[in-house]
Amino acid sequence: MVDSSTVLIFLLVLGGGQSELDTKITSSGEAAEWEDPDLSLQGSCQPVPSCQKCILSHPSCAWCKQLNFTASGEAEARRCARREELLARGCPAQELEEPRGRQEVLQDKPLSQGDRGEGATQLAPQRIRVTLRPGEPQKFRVRFLRAAGYPVDLYYLMDLSYSMKDDLERVRQLGHALLVRLQEVTHSVRIGFGSFVDKTVLPFVSTVPSKLHHPCPSRLERCQPPFSFHHVLSLTGDAQAFEREVGRQNVSGNLDSPEGGFDAILQAALCQEQIGWRNVSRLLVFTSDDTFHTAGDGKLGGIFMPSDGRCHLDSNGVYTNSAEFDYPSVGQVAQALTAANIQPIFAVTGATLPVYQELRQLIPKSAVGELSEDSSNVVQLIMDAYDSLSSTVTLEHSPLPPGVSISFESHCKGPEKTEGEAGDRGQCNDVRVNQTVDFWVTLQATHCLPEAHVLRLWALGFSEELTVELHTVCDCNCGDAQPHAPYCSDGQGDLQCGICSCAPGRLGQLCECSEADLSSPDLESGCRAPNGTGPLCSGKGRCQCGRCSCSGQSSGRLCECDDASCERHEGILCGGFGHCQCGVCHCHANHTGRACECSKSVDSCVSPEGGLCSGHGYCKCNRCQCLDGYYGALCDQCLGCKSPCEQYRDCAECGAFGTGPLAANCSVVCADVNVTLTLAPNLDDGWCKERTIDNQLFFFLVEHAASGIVLRVRPQEKGVDHTRAIILGCTGGIVAVGLGLVLAYRLSVEIYDRREYRRFEKEQQQLNWKQDNNPLYKSAITTTVNPRFQGTNGRSPSLSLTREAD
């Protein structure tokens, strides 16, 4: 006997596989509806089966939570649409669930100068909460006031290699002069001092014991052993202490040209307690006469461990781990300076200035100045750099969480603005004391954040910051959650946001049927046409508990209506001037047509004289339909008729220049024409181009005014006849080019001949003539000796035979 489930599966295959078996759903109630979005409407609001998915699908989407909002056979996903569409379909405004992003200012102390810079409020607001809906930007304003006399901490970091010997003598007397100059702009200033040379390993310094003890060239000079970085003096307001500690310093020495300045900068930025940085403007003056080592150079000395980005100063202020960690990279240095809110000033000699100017592009809010050979201009250099850095306001941000973007609009001088790219900084230059600048910050999220994120915004070089509490809205707050709701078939499901989430084993829009009823033919009959033929739900949905659950934009008892099948105009459904309902466009009040493509307005058909299509046609869909023989946008032109340019040419000529065929009676013939001279900046297609009776070109524009015809004529430009100059110039140019080619040819031949002659002379000098035999020559004389013949003197005479060579 054949199992009933086998028969059912066989029938499903014959019927295209559409059955209630396809509609089994979980307790969430979402799998009963499929998604079939119109691909031509990607990026707009598409039907989705839940409120949460709806608000996350597109920022323009809203959800109608009204009970019984969807019609019979209409998918619950139709609750998701644009606000205007839902209101037009009868959803009350109070039943719309459309959470929006929002902002809440938590702390906003007013901007103030404070007492001589102390206690100033330069950045406002101080704390804000921003809630983002994915895809929807949120924009808020940040204000900055440059206060006068803002406190400054300045740390002087000096290269003490031997080549900086004369510079050290200047710096020993620097403390008082530097404090005096800085106190001119701020009453609260502190200075500190640190020095550097290089890593104490080969090949950076000599490891010969005597050289390690005294690396200077002369044994008579005062010299200290090489070191990487030494923090000498913490930040202080005592100028005498600065000069006293610097006076105790001596130069050192190393082998290679680049110095270990990056190690020193990184430690000065990381060891904030040892340096004594306050929460004020921080300046780091870096002086050197050479370039710097960077990440990877340490491998030359057998150092492979990358810099760990931590402070490694001992109790004496010496960087003790220089032989263990490689030099930091430019990115590490820039990140450490930015995190510590330190503004570096690179005071370097002219030979290395281009290198540090390139480095300046990679480190935010840094300055570069050219140092004289003996550092005599260092005070003025520092003051110039301080003025430049203080007048530049750069709004920086902490790292963003994944999926969140940021952009800036900098309003530096009134309404003028400079837009930055996403992730860029806001910046204003040349900001004066007591001047306020605005930054508009835009935040946008692409998806939900797993948890709240704290974002910091601050102006580089200043201590204040704005804290942004970043949240995302990713769920609906319908307020109608009801477990075992009577609305859902007497408690067969939970009600939330207007739809039922069925209990296990229950199905349907209202959880009205069970899984045991899926194979009932009576249920499927409710999803077919009365004649019993055709696919279930017209092939546009699924049969669910004897009722059709339609997909996409389909609706109706049998999903026979498709709200996305209406005609389109210029690729837009119903031309954008109506809504589609069951395959028919229902147009707005001022439009008509199968695709609402026809406007009932006649504004584009009215001619300047006030007539409709110039009296030579009729207006249809806000466009003139001309009668036979007429053409033009307003039917104002005809075959054989004069164009406006031809019609008013003589009046324009006589009225503007007093010439032409109408010059004698211009005021009579052209009485209804007003001619004015004008200097048009450019001539577009509307200007007439005609010639006067003496063949001079002129331009005029025909305008229709209430008082009559107005001709705007452009005055003739009196030019100079350049014919002779053009002819002479062309002739002279041809002659000059010819002479140039001949001279170039003769010059190339002369150069070639001289080169060949020199080569010939060189070969003659290298010749070494000597006499030698021809290896192919064979002598014609042959000598033969008779071994048995004994002469009188005991010698065997030789017999010489002469033969001719072949």
From Swiss-Prot:
Its main location: membrane. GO terms for biological process: cell-matrix adhesion involved in ameboidal cell migration; heterotypic cell-cell adhesion; integrin-mediated signaling pathway; leukocyte migration; leukocyte tethering or rolling; receptor clustering; substrate adhesion-dependent cell spreading; T cell migration. Residues 98-123, 786-806 are annotated as: Disordered. The chain crosses the membrane at residues 725-745. Mg(2+) binds at S161, S163, E259. Disulfide bonds join C51-C476, C54-C80, C64-C91, C216-C223, C271-C311, C412-C428, C448-C474, C478-C497, C488-C500, C502-C511, C513-C545, C527-C543, C537-C548, C550-C559, C561-C582, C566-C580, C574-C585, C587-C596, C598-C621, C605-C619, C613-C624, C626-C635, C638-C641, C645-C688, C651-C670, C654-C666. Glycans are attached at N68, N250, N279, N434, N531, N590, N665, N674. Gene3D superfamilies: Cytochrome c1, transmembrane anchor, C-terminal (1.20.5.100), Laminin (2.10.25.10), ligand-binding face of the semaphorins, domain 2 (3.30.1680.10), ntegrin, alpha v. Chain A, domain 3 (2.60.40.1510), von Willebrand factor, type A domain (3.40.50.410). Residues 1-19 form the signal peptide. This is Integrin beta-7. It comes from Mus musculus. The gene is Itgb7.
